[in-house]
Amino acid sequence: MRILIILSIILCSLFARADLEYVDNDIYNYNGGRNENGCLEVYDPYEKFNRKVFAFNSVLDYIILRPLAIGYKNITNDYVKARVNSFVSNVDTPLTAVNYGLQLNYDKTMKSVWRFLINTTLGIGGLFDVAGKVGLPSERQTFGSTLAHYGVAPGPYLVLPIIGSTNARDMTDSVITNYALNPLMYYTHNDFDLGVLAVSKINDRYVVLPFSDYVMKNSTDPYVAIRSALHRAREASVQYPENFKCPKPKN
């Protein structure tokens, strides 16, 4: 049983990205210009390799992960989906608190702690977002967010087997973010942790289902569309130091 759960978690990483919370038609138009931080919108020196891995991952997603997301969509109503989304967000909150602490942002650290305590108690284990109604909105910080805070650029775009799309800065997030820096992992049973992680990834895949389906059906180059969209969404979610400029990649 544990092996099946672990396999589900790995497969759910192919397309699941919480950064893509909405779909905008403009997001599909790849533009290799420079963003407000001075970074190349996408630096992809390993595109030939990445495209091969992308094709491999896409097959696995179509055969296994996408059907799971569709099944989740069909068997649950909006109320259940909202509860799952709230629960998943609450589980991530201690990690956000830790990363804000590493960024020396003590105000947001304490707000994240209070958000977790309120939702875990009054929100019945995080099923209801009580804290959001009293001025403590949901925020998500990963170790990659912390590295960006201290001036680490995204680096080369990468598509890794099974893991999926990432970049040099964020590629360790799946291990460091989900395990090493999340306090809950040290106080809960392994089976519970794996179950929560599996539910989280399936929920993430469901969230991006409209986006991925649209791209696969309408884009002339799904690789470029997904690369551009994921990079833009991720860069929009991090905060670099004031006056920070990403280094120009070497030719």
UniProtKB/Swiss-Prot annotation:
This is Uncharacterized protein RF_0076. The lineage of its organism: Bacteria, Pseudomonadati, Pseudomonadota, Alphaproteobacteria, Rickettsiales. Keywords: Signal. PANTHER family: INTERMEMBRANE PHOSPHOLIPID TRANSPORT SYSTEM LIPOPROTEIN MLAA (PTHR30035:SF3), LIPOPROTEIN VACJ-RELATED (PTHR30035). The keyword Aminoacyl-tRNA synthetase does not apply. Pfam families: MlaA. Residues 1-18 form the signal peptide. Belongs to the MlaA family.
